[in-house]
Amino acid sequence: MRQRCVGGLIAAAIALLAPAAPASADDPILGAASYPDMTTYRCHTDAIPIYPGQNLNLLATTKTCPNAVKVSGPGDASVFAPGSTAQGYITRFAPSMVEIKPDGQLVTPSVWDLHLHHVVWVAPGGGPTFASGEEKTHVKLPQGYGFKVAGDANWGLNYMIHNLTAVGGRQVYITWEIDWVPETAPARTDIKPANVRWLDVAGFPQIYPVFDAERGFDTNGDGKYVFPDEVPTDPSQPGYEERRKISSARQWTVPAGGATLVFAAGHLHPGGLHVDLQVTRGGQTMQLFRSDAHYYEPAGAVSWDVSMTATRPDWRISLQAGDTISESVTYDVSRASWYESMGILPVFVAAAGDPAAKDPFNDDAAVRAMYDEGGILTHGRLPENVDKKARKDLKLPDPRKLKSKGRRVPKSGIDIGGFGYSPGGYSAVRGYSVNRIRPPVVRPGTSVTFTNLDALFGMSQTEQTWHTITSCSAPCNLGSGIGYPLARGPIKFDSGQLGYGNALSTEVTTGSDVYTTPPLTKRGKTYTYFCRIHPFMRGSIRVAPRPHGHGHA
């Protein structure tokens, strides 16, 4: 993705975007390494089109720093020009995304409107290296280490941009800012190359590396679900279906010669609490690092208003050949289920021999002290991640208190079309028609079938809009955001994303446009539901309090 005609004007606009809110005195921010010949650059893709309601998992190509503009330092952008033979080290990587408004203005979109579900930079000749989710963690390698790459190198770019609205015709840039230290001749000795070992609890062979963290999956009843540790081996136990999602990519065995771990920071989704790194040698296991989710969100672990902790500058781990590092991730399932969850931990690894590195088993006290000290944030609160519309009182009626007035669920079920459920569906906006919110009635024990007319077989990916039917706790009628509604209905059901994705989106969707709920059994009960992808979409169904033929008020 290249666009050389865009230069200083765009870079200046990006620079003026609202910065992260300053951290409090209790939340120190990790500083970046510094070198006399280091230069900071801003980079961005060409414009990426955004379709109504999209949640596409896509692949593109990019360069080390396309559309490069110097921010500070002695260098110039020619090191990234086509045909450049320059080599250098990336010592800091700060990802983000901006929307291109019709007048050319660049704005960081709010997470409840349009957000960067994930983006992964795949290194030339290697694997996943830099990445971001909505929390936008910065990579800040410690002094003396960097990721070595050519200035004109080709990279892969896997990205998933989630449009939570029905508005199309939008465009964004994926952006990143890097600190670049040039290689010299003879080769410099003050920076050692570090590469990434990508740990992923639900990665390969899955293309879309997710699992479900549901209420009731915590085997000890503590409300915390540790994946993959708490996935049962008994097929009759709740959560056994997640077993097939456990990936061998969650662990790595150190090759001959040993290794030094120099940096790590985890990625998880709302509901996630922490990502843990441990090492095993000769049957003994030692904890190395916990990447904690620091939620600014007043409601707790329910939104993207979060920053992740990374390892501190003095964190160095010396490993021997045959040692195995592994990761796990923990979710809070005490009050909601979290579908399509992630647990990823990119670990930067260098050659053995750093005298400051500590061996987990020979220097166990020092390693334990580093673990107990905990991590450090790479940035403060991001204004775009404040979930300000969630849980707003929209003055909408409680579906449980509305009479159905003869409305029934048709034998064909409920249709989804034009970003709405019908009958019984509504948009969570002020002033919505009360008559359309009235819940349709079914007989006790009925399973209701939904058909997504927004994503029928044969439609292209960009024509489709994928929706879910996910149970929520009544009244489920407050303002939409990341942290509301939550998947916490009295009957646990979730359809997955109904539609027909292809290529990298194959596993994002169910491969069907139809979903049928479990039986709805409780007489007189009004069941509410929403779409996880477009949470302004709501609906309800009422079970008749007496035989269907006698009618309902």
Locations of regions flagged by a protein language model:
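Bacterial N-terminal signal peptides that target proteins for export
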Residues: 1-9
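C-terminal segment of classical bacterial N-terminal signal peptides
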Residues: 15-23
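Beta-strand-centric surfaces of beta-sandwich/beta-rich domains
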Residues: 26-395, 401
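Extracytoplasmic copper-binding redox domains, predominantly the cupredoxin/blue-copper superfamily
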Residues: 393-553
